[in-house]
Regions:
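Extreme N-terminal tail/first-helix region
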Residues: 1-29
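N-terminal short leaders/motifs
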Residues: 1-12, 42, 86-95
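A generic structural micro-feature
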Residues: 30, 45-47, 81, 130
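Short beta-strand segments
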Residues: 33-69
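Short hydrophobic/aromatic beta-strand or adjacent loop that forms the aromatic wall/cage
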Residues: 35, 132-135
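Short beta-strand element of the conserved SAM-dependent methyltransferase core
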Residues: 38, 136-141
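Short strand-connecting beta-turns/loops that link adjacent beta-strands
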Residues: 58-60, 94, 143
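Short, structured beta-strand-loop surface elements
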Residues: 68-122, 128-132, 140
């Protein structure tokens, strides 16, 4: 419960800093890990939802994971992209339409290993929860 509250607070602060700086700040995690902003269509609300996530470049796209910082609850954006796989990705202030594809096997392993190499807590997340962490490839559309 405490960890969930801390995560929500951190995400709220991250969003505010990104907004207040007009996107100049909040593009990396501590240590330099890349942050992308995904925008997904809410499966229930029909409203667009914007979420900051750690990401790794791979195969012409970006690998992301629904870790929810190691909480048992699957993040809402995962459910959203499973219903509506089209959304947007913002990389360094450049937003593009994108397709979200859940991956498995070798690609899933490579993305997750890349995330661990940038933010070692990902290893702890998988150890500490009982659910599978869904992994996605976000492929930006060509302009």
């Amino acid at each position: 419960m405490v960890w969930g509250t801390a995560l929500r607070t951190t995400t709220t602060v991250h969003r505010f800093i990104h907004w207040a700086s007009r996107g100049r700040l909040g593009r990396t995690f501590p240590g330099g890990a890349k942050v992308v902003w995904i925008t997904t269509l809410g499966r229930k609300s029909g409203e667009w939802r914007r979420t900051p996530l750690l990401a790794v470049p791979i195969e012409g796209g970006w690998g992301i994971a629904g870790s929810n910082a190691g909480q048992e609850k699957i993040p809402g954006w995962v459910y959203n992209v499973e219903v509506h796989n089209l959304g947007r990705i913002d990389i360094d202030g450049h937003e593009r339409e994108a397709t979200f594809t859940r991956v498995s096997g070798d690609l899933e392993d490579r993305i997750y290993a890349g995330l661990i190499s940038q933010w070692s807590a990902y290893e702890m997340y998988q150890r500490n929860i009982q659910r599978e962490i869904p992994v996605f490839l976000v492929t930006p559309k060509e302009n």
